[in-house]
């Protein structure tokens, strides 16, 4: 992964108010972490373009933002459902053994017996630990993201090894 690779951190939703503000669905945790990045890359009409964040505030369960040169609801409407990204280099460094969720999605999951369980489709945050949503052609599995269950993660080989019975 290169520092200039894009990481999707949210999606523009719909216009909010009369001055060009836009509701945002944040993929970050906490959701207002997205506001820590002053320039976003917006995928508009299948092309990435930089837009500067002028202001933003929490309006649970959404954020609302004001982006540069978007000053009315008609202009804001053109950006509905556009993806928001930042460059990977703008993300903070992680401690050894920590991962961004975006890096785990799409990885193959096998158990310690070498049985393929599927691929990581998404993650769920729960009160006690995160959960991997692992999908295969046959089924969906919810695998706890704990130190006992997760045996190893290899981002280069794109594989997660888990201590998990294939029948669960």
Swiss-Prot record:
Domain PRC barrel, first and last residues per copy: 96-168
Record's comment describing the protein's domains: The PRC barrel domain binds ribosomal protein uS19.
Physiological role: An accessory protein needed during the final step in the assembly of 30S ribosomal subunit, possibly for assembly of the head region. Essential for efficient processing of 16S rRNA. May be needed both before and after RbfA during the maturation of 16S rRNA. It has affinity for free ribosomal 30S subunits but not for 70S ribosomes.
Assembly and oligomerization: Binds ribosomal protein uS19.
Main localization, broad class: cytoplasm
Source taxon at top rank: Bacteria
Family (UniProt): Belongs to the RimM family.
Pfam families in the record: PRC_RimM, RimM
Keyword Chaperone: yes
Stored SUPFAM superfamilies: PRC-barrel domain (SSF50346), Translation proteins (SSF50447)
GO cellular component: cytoplasm; ribosome
Compartments where located: Cytoplasm
UniProt name for this protein: Ribosome maturation factor RimM
Keyword rRNA processing among record annotations: yes
Keyword tags: Chaperone, Cytoplasm, Ribosome biogenesis, rRNA processing
Gene3D superfamilies with a match to the protein in the record: PRC-barrel domain, RimM
GO biological process, one term: ribosomal small subunit biogenesis
GO function term, MF aspect, one: ribosome binding
